[in-house]
Swiss-Prot record:
It is found in: Cytoplasm; Late endosome membrane. One of its GO terms (biological process) is proteolysis. It is a peripheral membrane protein. Disulfide bonds: none annotated. The gene is DOA4. It comes from Eremothecium gossypii (strain ATCC 10895 / CBS 109.51 / FGSC 9923 / NRRL Y-1056). This is Ubiquitin carboxyl-terminal hydrolase 4. Belongs to the peptidase C19 family. It holds the Pfam family UCH.
């Protein structure tokens, strides 16, 4: 009997359309590694998607027809293309990684703002869910699909009895993937018995996540078997999500609904067009009561009990699609008959508008122009402070500040920064001998060649702190060091312990604390600093310190709790307005926050922040520098650095190290000098180690792997090479970050023994032989005179994993209070003399001391 073709026209399925989008991404020019070009393509494609949505909305009678199907299909494909490029491709680019790590790169910062805008558009788009629903309802269903036997709409709840039938009923209704949305510890103790079950902790994801984020972030420490199950999620007939459904676990219930919505509407990597997603009614509580024989505890997961995931084999998520060469055009792919997954569809063309190349819109360039003004906090939409669970305690809150205009009027009259008395380069540089005769007359020419077109230079002496606090400002400086022994806790504003521990440690820095308490920091604000926030971050930080001082100075007890704690709402909002990483309630790395805060304060107080960037060294100047002793070359580089970065933060916290590459064939070297505020040192993978061992590991000669070998300018090719890091400048206050997490977020919980008094003299570059020859000049020492002994005054501690851990702090508050322990709202004096020496140490704070 001849086959009778159906008269009805069907939509292509979600999986078919997703395949088209993936094919376009891999075959049509998106193999570029230029982040700006890819962002331009995304903006253009998103504009096309919006045009299709407008056409869909303009249809007065949405009667199923080929033309209507074309609109919905094209809209979905456009959206999918943007999501694949933005969420899959761009995060893998080296340029993206550099932009995220380099806060000084203005272009990178602008690209990240555009990228974040695109992510925000994707996540908050309220039309794609309806488009997917329409496509699913009007695409041909697989007659053998088992999930059609259950007449429950995806996203709804099913009772425990139905789930049991699905898992073990005689009808074998289909395959089920269970998703347990509870803390890993609860999951280990007891969960539903099934070989296809995974645990996604409720704290591991947020509203802006997609299915890609779940795989790459939320499940980064999950067992291999669970990661494999999640990767095959689209092969299951049903996904059933459950949590501990009770009044005490409202947050988990909210996260459960969030996860279901994510799987249904934001599954960009694996389209769940044939998989239904359900919620287990009553949660695990009802299941365990009804089917106690169908519950089981996990064995062999003790690695999660103490947060030590160093033994786990964490996986890199595979790319959605392989990289291919360009061979097709977009309109060819969409308009022609397509054989997708073995299903041949009758040809029908997409709207003619799509037959041309993706159109460009002028808005992309506008994003660059408008992004530079986005750093002003008062120009951003307001945020609602996070709700706190304890309603019985009223915490003192940092007050809201005046508007920006009011603040500018209230500032003391500042003389123009460019009018500051500046010494000429020739006077700023005085003789330090060069040990190699070939470089004996090179310093002047080197400075000339290296030059900054800067109209100003920093003074020869650093900003004074130790001799007289009065030089910091013209205010009434009544806060004496003896009065800095205040202590108060900070309320956790939703996983903000990473912020609290750093604030407590930084307040142990007496010079910094004094400067903000007496308001002398205002005399250093540079309103024209290119990367600053016009003093807004500094103001919020000062307000918080004042509030903590006010509520902490009168405490006569040896401890404090939530009744005396301060809630840092306004400061947290300010930080989130400047850096979106700190905007929501997700856990962050405390050392990254420390770096952000110090960088932000530096830029606000940067006296040279509006100077033009430094010019790169010429090849001749670089060769001259390589011939100099590292002691001299680093001093020259530091003086160059100060022409664009000069602030009290630099004087208090910043140091410098040299990273030197050397060709093992011809012995040529290339040295770069890098300033730092937080010095990250590796932790050896041994049973125990000392802090000195960490510095030894940090400064040892490293033989580079073949793919990392240096392209030697003399040999004109990649050669076997080594890398050596040398500390060339040690700051007044040294912040040391113990690198306990590797690139896969495995944590090294090795106990690092750190001393109360640390001697780093042996690690400081001291290759200058003090031979003075003609035409040599001497650079200001700026405190770089050995020995370098440091006194410990703060420890930020981390317990658990990077995604699900907790931060606390130990701080030496001076002679009156001594060492104190801080855990959010609670604080107390230490209970034993060596309590602050702990295995959980993560960031160490040292202050330089001088022998009397």
């Amino acid at each position: 009997m001849p086959h009778i073709q159906e008269s009805r026209v069907w939509c292509r399925s979600i999986s078919q359309l997703s395949h088209l989008a993936e094919q376009f991404v891999t075959e049509n020019g998106t193999e570029s590694t230029d982040m700006k070009l890819l962002l331009q393509q995304c903006v253009d494609t998103l504009s096309n998607y919006q045009d299709e949505c407008k056409k869909i909305k303009s249809v007065s009678k949405p009667v199923p027809s080929k033309e209507l199907y074309d609109l919905y299909e094209t809209a979905y494909v456009y959206f999918k293309i943007v999501s694949l490029i933005v969420l899959n491709k761009i995060p893998k680019l080296e340029e993206y990684a550099r932009a995220k790590s380099d806060a000084v790169d203005r272009t990178g910062k602008q690209l990240l703002e555009i990228y974040n805008m695109l992510v925000n558009r994707l996540v908050k788009d309220d039309r794609i869910a309806e488009i997917k629903r329409f496509v699913k309802e009007n695409s041909r269903r697989d007659p053998e699909a088992k999930n059609e036997q259950i007449g429950v709409e995806s996203g709804k709840s099913i009772p425990a009895t139905l789930l049991r039938n699905l898992l073990m009923g005689p009808s074998a209704s289909g395959t089920v993937l269970l998703v347990d949305v509870r803390p890993r510890l609860d999951f280990m103790r007891c969960h539903i018995k099934s070989s296809s079950i995974i645990c996604i902790e409720p704290v591991s994801f947020k509203e802006s996540y997609t299915d890609i984020d779940l795989g790459k972030k939320s499940m980064i420490t999950s067992p291999d078997a669970e990661i494999a199950l999640f990767q095959d999620r689209d092969k299951f007939d049903y996904i059933v999500v459950y949590t501990q459904d009770s009044e005490k676990n409202k947050h988990n219930v909210q996260q459960q609904q969030l996860l279901v919505d994510l799987l249904i509407n934001r599954s960009f990597e694996k389209a769940l067009d044939r998989t239904k997603v359900f919620i287990l009614a009553g949660g695990f509580s009802e299941w365990s009561n009804a089917h106690p024989d169908f519950c089981v505890s996990s064995q062999g997961d003790s690695v999660y009990l103490n947060g030590d995931t160093s033994g786990l084999s964490l996986q890199l998520m595979p790319q959605t699609t392989p990289q291919k060469q360009y061979n097709n055009m977009f309109q060819t792919m969409l308009s022609g008959p397509t054989d997708v997954h073995g299903i041949i569809r009758n040809p029908h063309n997409f709207p003619t508008q799509q037959k041309s190349k993706l159109k460009r819109v002028p808005s992309f360039r506008d994003y660059f122009r408008s992004s530079s003004s986005s750093s002003n906090i008062n120009e951003r939409p307001g945020s609602v402070p996070p709700q706190l669970s304890n309603g019985s305690t009223i915490y003192p809150e940092t007050p809201k500040l005046m508007t920006n205009d009011e603040y500018m009027k209230s500032l003391p009259q500042l003389s123009p920064i460019t009018a500051r008395a500046i010494t000429s380069p020739s006077r700023a540089l005085s003789a330090v001998g060069v040990s190699k005769s070939s470089a004996s007359n090179s310093i002047s020419s080197l400075l000339a060649n290296s030059g900054s077109a800067s109209p100003m230079k920093p003074p020869d002496t650093p900003l004074p702190f130790t001799d007289s606090i009065k030089t910091l400002g013209q205010q009434n400086l009544t806060v004496a060091v003896s009065n800095l022994n205040f202590s108060v806790g900070l309320v956790n504003c939703g996983n903000s312990c990473y912020m609290s521990c750093i604030i407590q440690c930084l307040l142990g820095t007496q010079e910094l604390c004094t400067m903000f308490l007496n308001n002398s920091y205002q005399n250093h604000i540079n309103l024209n600093s290119r990367l600053g926030s016009k003093g807004l971050l500094a103001r919020y930080f000062s307000q918080l310190i004042h509030q903590m001082y006010q509520y902490g100075k009168d405490i006569r007890k040896k401890m404090g709790n939530e009744k005396t704690a301060v809630i840092p709402t306004q400061f947290k909002i300010a930080c989130g307005s400047i850096n979106s990483s700190f905007k929501d309630n997700t856990q962050q790395d405390c050392q990254e926050f420390c770096q952000f805060l110090l960088d932000g304060l530096h830029e606000d107080l940067n006296q040279c922040g509006n100077n033009p960037p430094l010019k790169e060294l010429s090849e001749e100047a670089e060769k001259m520098r390589e011939m100099m002793p590292m002691r001299l070359a680093s001093a020259i580089e530091w003086e160059r650095y100060l022409t664009t970065d000069f602030s009290v933060i630099v004087d208090l916290f910043q140091g410098q190290y040299a990273s030197q590459l050397q060709c093992k064939v011809c012995q040529r070297t290339s040295t770069t000098y890098q300033p730092f505020s937080v010095l990250s040192v590796p932790v050896p993978s041994t049973r125990t180690c000392t802090l000195t061992d960490c510095f030894t590991e940090f400064t040892k000669i490293e033989t580079l792997e073949q793919e990392e070998q240096w392209s030697c300018p003399s040999c004109k090719k990649r050669q076997p090479s080594t890398k050596k890091i040398t500390i060339t400048r040690l700051p007044r206050n040294l912040i040391i970050h113990l690198k306990r997490f590797d690139n896969m977020l495995n944590k090294n919980n090795v106990f690092v023994s750190y001393p109360s008094v640390l001697d780093l003299t042996a690690f400081w570059a001291n290759d200058y032989d003090k031979k003075v020859t003609n035409n040599n000049v001497e650079l200001p020492s700026r405190g770089q005179v050995p020995p370098f002994n440091y006194q410990l005054y703060g420890i930020a501690c981390h317990d658990g994993t990077l995604r699900a851990g907790h931060y606390t702090a130990y701080v030496n508050k001076g002679a009156v209070l001594g060492w104190c322990y801080y855990d959010d709202t609670n604080w107390r004096q230490i209970r034993s003399a060596r309590e602050y020496i702990t295995q959980n140490a993560y960031v160490l704070f040292y202050h330089r001391i001088h022998s009397t």
